Amino acid sequence: MTDLSDPTAAARAAATTINSAAGIDSHDIALVLGSGWGGAADLLGETISEVPAAEVPGFHAPAVEGHGATLRTVRIAASGKHALVLGSRTHYYEGKGVRAVAHGVRTAAAAGCSSLVLTNGCGGLNRNWAAGTPVLISDHINLTGTSPIEGANFVDLTDLYSPRMRAIAKDIDPSLDEGVYAQFRGPHYETPAEVRMAGIQIGRASCRERV
């Protein structure tokens, strides 16, 4: 496993591997595919490179069913820009630490990505949402007690979930709903009391990656 004692160096090494495999200098946007979202990458455009996650520094084969095992570069049909599709995600409950959880996002930034789209499979408390309903995250409650930020870096999270990007999504599909997402540590599921005190969406991924 790659040494993550220097997260920035590890991300640069992974980004170099990914960009070289795709034959490009940089990527434009990153997409992290959560449980059940694997097929979304096929709708974006032409895949020009696909690397097994285990062959990229700092990544490993997914430990959870429903996640892809590759890092894919897709040329978006409409714009010609390059998307880095991260099919492999590390969850905190796997015991690899917060640096491993944030490694994918740090790698995306090192690869040149200036925008990030996170997806996950989570529970919803709105009874109007049928299973599989896509819902935007408007804000989050981090109940894990952990952060990917180290040292005296006081990052402003006011607009963490971009109002601009959410507006674009709603322009495309006005029926999209949104709500506050609460993340627990896992791997166990939440108690009924924990569910009642949390947000309207509940899961075990995304918050630390977004930070």
What is the predicted function of each stretch?
Residues 13, 103-106, 164, 168, ...:
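Short Gly/charged-rich anion-binding patches and loops
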Residues 159-200:
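Active-site rim beta-loop-alpha module in soluble metabolic enzymes
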Residues 2-157:
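Metabolite-binding pocket within alpha/beta catalytic cores that recognizes anionic/polar moieties
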Residues 5, 95, 160, 185-186, ...:
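Residue-level marker of alpha-helix boundaries and capping positions
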Residues 202-211:
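Residue-level detector of conserved catalytic or cofactor/ligand-binding positions
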Residues 50, 151, 155, 176-178, ...:
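A generic, residue-level signal for flexible/boundary positions that often mark functional hotspots
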Residues 29, 118, 178-180, 208:
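Residue-level detector of family-conserved "landmark" positions at structurally sensitive sites
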